[in-house]
Amino acid sequence: TEYGIKYKLDLAEIMWSPGNTGWRSALSGPEKVSEFYRFDKPKTIIDYFAGIGYFSIQMAKGYPEAEVIAIDKNPKSIEYLTLNAKNNAVENLEIINDDCRNIERKADVIHLGYIGNTIDFLEHAYDYLNDNGTVIFHEAYRNNWLGFKSRSDWGAIPENFSDLMSQNSFTVEKFERVKFYGPSTSHIIARLKKN
């Protein structure tokens, strides 16, 4: 159980990162996390890499009037996601077992909770994001590219990152370091607004 959500999974088959504790909380956790996940009456939220429901179940609970679509191409993840949605009495969650790039559904919010070439999925997200829509973007970058030299740098929006998102037609509204991801590398989260 984490922030009121019960998860069932087999660690031999499915990824679970203890370093993401708090960041999976969406609206029910620490204020610095909730700020990323506060949306103005979204009608549709899509989680592109839903896994076992780390974020999509929290968003379905936090936005009961919204349609939440959870997509993952791993059948084992979908099996646990379906079970976790049932165990948490989530009724506004549609689960799709497919590659997110095969899904052509419009949304007010698209969650890209993935590490490793997340940028490759940003164009698809842009194409299916409603005007003024929001993307929650996770990725790992080298600290020197981000300009992280000390802890005081962690809350600032790095110029390189801002430029990269601008090239992809997004404005960075909010940026935070989640955790160290390896030597001189940080897992980051950003809230992006469609231009």
Model-derived regions, located:
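Conserved class I S-adenosyl-L-methionine
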Residues: 42-49
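Core SAM-dependent methyltransferase catalytic element
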Residues: 181-195
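S-adenosylmethionine
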Residues: 98-167, 173-176
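Non-catalytic substrate-recognition/targeting regions of SAM-dependent transferases
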Residues: 1-19
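S-adenosyl-L-methionine
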Residues: 71-109, 117
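Residues at the starts of beta-strands that form the adenosine-phosphate
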Residues: 44, 67, 92, 134
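Conserved alpha-helix/loop element of class I SAM-dependent methyltransferases that forms part
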Residues: 22-41
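Conserved SAM-binding loop of SAM-dependent methyltransferases across substrates and taxa
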Residues: 52-65
